[in-house]
Amino acid sequence: MARIGVETDVPLKVKPHPKFKEIYTATLEEGSQRLATRNLTPGLNVYGERLVKFKGVEYRIWDAFRSKLAAAILKGVQNVPIEPGSKVLYLGAASGTTPSHVSDIVGNSGYVYCVEFAQRSIRDLVNNVAAYRPNISPLLEDARMPEKYAMFISGKVDTIYCDVAQPEQAKLLADNADVFLKPAGWVMIAVKAQSIDVTMDPEAVYRQEANILRKRGFDVKEVLNLEPFDKAHAMIVAQRCKQ
């Protein structure tokens, strides 16, 4: 089950991110600044993250060492196509760390479809996250076979976020986009270089995956190295080219 979090009573400051809606920067009592999202389920945390309250609103501290999306934001990514009201397909949801923050961002007017193949991870996702968040649907499916779960996804999605340790990450993402993504929709892919080719230089792997997306009809906006938060990882952000 979800954990009951402990709020801090120490005064701090929370301010909206200057670029991205429903993402915040929290200044903690020791002066450090951390990313945060407004908690959709007040009083509950997901992975032991700290809960803080500012002006009557509860926020969840977002650990960039446990979330590649948070790492990309701290590294200065210019496009985060996940916002209030967005419908998101999340491939490789694992136990729900980052999906829970995506759930906070899209809010009750948005929705997150979470595809995960590992049974233990999907169990944690169901019991600790989806059970308390009505805007999340967990799907025990193989992201390489989008046709198997198409019946569970209503309409087209605004954004596909992909974090799967597969050798053909960009192809997998593009295959899902062909089925589920809206025209001119966006994708974000957290590329793990060693899952694709351990013999290649990571930067070469990132270029290869970006080129695959281009060949599949995407305009690649950014390729962002995620070190020091994640070694040999990059975030690629792309938009489907208008037909």
Q: In which residue ranges do the predicted regions lie?
A:
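C-terminal substrate-binding/active-site "lid" region of AdoMet-derived donor-dependent transferases
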Residues: 2-8, 121-124, 132, 174-242
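Conserved class I S-adenosyl-L-methionine
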Residues: 83-94, 111-113
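Conserved alpha-helix/loop element of class I SAM-dependent methyltransferases that forms part
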Residues: 18-21, 42-49, 63-87
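N-terminal auxiliary segments of SAM/dcSAM-dependent transferases
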Residues: 1-59
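Helix-to-beta-strand junctions that scaffold the AdoMet/dcAdoMet cofactor pocket
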Residues: 83, 106-107, 180-184
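Conserved SAM-binding loop of SAM-dependent methyltransferases across substrates and taxa
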Residues: 94-108
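S-adenosyl-L-methionine
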Residues: 113-169
